[in-house]
Regions:
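Arg/Lys-rich, low-complexity, intrinsically disordered basic segments
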Residues: 1-130
Length: 130
């Protein structure tokens, strides 16, 4: 499944939603801070993202998936909520679906990392016992 050097191709639907999010942010002047803007830039401009960005995208959606879509003015086209603008900037519903797929890959990488640390510790302990 990969390691921390793996790159994750950004689906076209995610890119399109990220562009819409940027347009909304420009029109209304709110929604998303420095991290959201940086990720939005990557989603719009790059072909793929690295492990660190993939983790941030996954973290965003896990934190916001039950809150933002239910928030006030989420579907208001004239005055959208900050939550909607951020949601779109992070890739919208397409980004949410993509993040669920990314999560599986990220989980494998994190489990491999933990297993490697355990094995390293066991080897160190084994070396002390000799």
């Amino acid at each position: 499944m990969g390691d921390k050097k793996t790159r994750y191709k950004i689906p076209s639907g995610v890119k399109e939603e990220a562009r819409r999010g940027r347009t909304l942010r420009t029109m209304h002047g709110y929604g998303g801070g420095k991290v959201t803007k940086a990720i939005n830039y990557r989603l719009r401009v790059q072909k793929d993202v690295g492990y660190g960005t993939a983790v941030k995208i996954d973290t965003y959606y896990r934190r916001h998936e039950d809150v933002d879509p239910k928030g006030e003015n989420f579907d208001n086209r004239k005055r959208p909520s900050k939550g909607l603008i951020m949601w779109k900037m992070m890739g919208g519903n397409a980004g949410h679906s993509w993040s669920k797929k990314l999560k599986k890959s990220l989980d494998v990488i994190q489990k491999k990392e933990r297993l490697n640390k355990i094995n390293q510790t066991l080897e160190e302990i084994h070396g002390m016992v000799r």
